[in-house]
A protein has these predicted regions:
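Active-site recognition of the HExxH zinc-binding catalytic motif
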Residues: 209-229
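Short Cys/His-rich micro-motifs in 6-15 aa windows
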Residues: 60-70, 113-122
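Post-HExxH zinc-binding segment in Zn-dependent metallohydrolases
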Residues: 224-279, 285-295
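Cys/His-rich microdomains that often coordinate metals
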Residues: 46-49, 63, 94-101, 117
């Protein structure tokens, strides 16, 4: 009897072989050659390129990004030969999507674009002009989730699966509330405008507000419902974050009328995290993604801190993955690296790259998130979907 290897869907995402008893496929995860994430380089001149590049800034070669191999390939007439197969540019390339798809991909869309459930109408050219920036942040999020080994079940595969509604309050005149409900993350494209987003950040007293930050926060709500699969896990979560069954609407009213409690800095990562246990989990999850994503980038570039310069016994060498490391190693590396990044930002006249403190209770919460992520099972899609509706909680909306 022959063994079946990993299968590749038309959008370029590899799934595990079907379970021998059920015939069902496991949730999707990236596979890299030799288990190492390749560096983004132009295949022609070998210069480093940004993940969102459509052309090489050095040699001007047209590029397409292959999700499975995590590499750029040269594109000619919208096609590239990859591992002996013909791949095509995503049909959303006009909105700056540089990912590649197989010929049979639904509507010619890549895996990341398939996750977008709603977007502005085609005649809303102003809003669509802002879509590219948000989609870029979303692709970066999807790449990181795959690198962490987290299951991604699309909204069009199962009810409660992950999806995105990317709408615009500026062009429609209707209010768009950023939030999460039953797997669907809603974002306001108006926040891709720097002046609009910065005005909101100042008005709300937030030290950090970006589209990627919104995505990482809202996906934290999604994964709380996915990764906490039994009552024991929920009990452990409640011991750290509080009881999520408390009234969410009452919490909103209390937070916006009274603000965060005095001394919140000793137990929470942000003022918003104090509002409700749902938000504390999502904020902590977002910071876990901030930390691991930044350290992985530093590792990929080759940035490290010399021991002698920093009065340490050993160099600080960030890792691309902390899956096999205790959270204490992750946070120790981050303590040192974040201080260095903050100094670099200040040298350019900017605010701190990471303007947050991590008190002991927050570190314990991050340890809980780390354990959840590093032990996330690649469960079958149906099992993940069944776990979502009962624990999805209320719609989480933030202003």
């Amino acid at each position: 009897m022959s063994k079946r290897g990993p299968e590749v869907s038309h959008d370029g995402v590899k799934s595990s072989p079907a379970h021998p008893a059920t015939g069902r496929h496991h949730s999707m995860r990236w596979h890299y050659r030799d288990g190492v994430i390749p560096q983004p380089r132009c295949p022609h001149c070998r210069q480093f390129v940004n993940l969102d590049a459509l052309r090489c800034p050095n040699c001007a070669a047209e590029l397409g990004y292959h999700l499975l191999n995590r590499q750029f390939y040269g594109v000619r007439r919208g096609q590239a030969i990859i591992d002996g197969q013909t791949w095509y540019t995503c049909s959303n390339r006009d909105w700056d999507c540089n990912w590649m798809v197989w010929e049979g991909a639904p509507a010619g869309r890549c895996f990341a674009c398939r996750l977008t459930r709603r977007r502005p109408d085609t005649d809303d050219t102003v809003a669509l002009g802002k879509l590219a920036k948000t989609e870029e942040a979303k692709r970066r999020l999807i790449l990181q989730l795959g690198d962490l080994g987290l299951p991604i079940v699309p909204w069009d595969v199962h009810d409660g699966g992950l999806g995105f509604d990317l709408l615009s309050s500026l062009t429609t005149g209707e209010r768009v509330i950023i939030g999460h409900a039953n797997g669907i993350i809603t974002l306001d494209l108006a926040e891709s405008l720097d002046d609009h987003r910065e005005a909101l950040r100042v008005r709300l007293g937030e030290p950090y507000r970006t589209m990627l930050g919104h995505l990482r926060h809202e996906v934290g709500h999604y994964y709380q419902g996915v990764l906490l699969t039994d009552e024991r896990a929920w009990t452990s979560c409640r011991e750290l974050f509080g009881d999520e069954r408390a009234s969410y609407q009452d919490a909103i009213k209390r937070h916006y009328s009274r603000g965060a409690p005095d001394g919140w800095q000793s137990s929470f990562i942000s003022e918003y995290a104090t509002m409700h246990p749902w938000e504390d989990f999502a904020e902590t999850f977002a910071h876990y993604l901030h930390i691991t994503g930044t350290l992985a980038t530093a590792a990929a570039i080759g940035i490290h801190l010399d021991a002698a310069t920093n009065v340490r016994d050993t160099d600080v060498v960030p890792l691309e993955s902390y899956r096999d490391e205790p959270v204490q190693q992750l946070l120790s590396d981050w303590d040192w690296m974040s201080r260095a990044f903050n100094r670099i930002n200040r040298a350019m006249g900017f605010g701190d790259l990471y303007p947050f403190q991590l008190p002991a209770p927050v570190r314990t919460k991050l340890e809980f998130i780390h354990d959840l992520v590093t032990h996330a099972p690649l469960t079958v899609d149906e099992q993940v979907a069944r776990a979502l509706p009962d624990r999805a909680g209320p719609a989480h909306q933030r202003g």
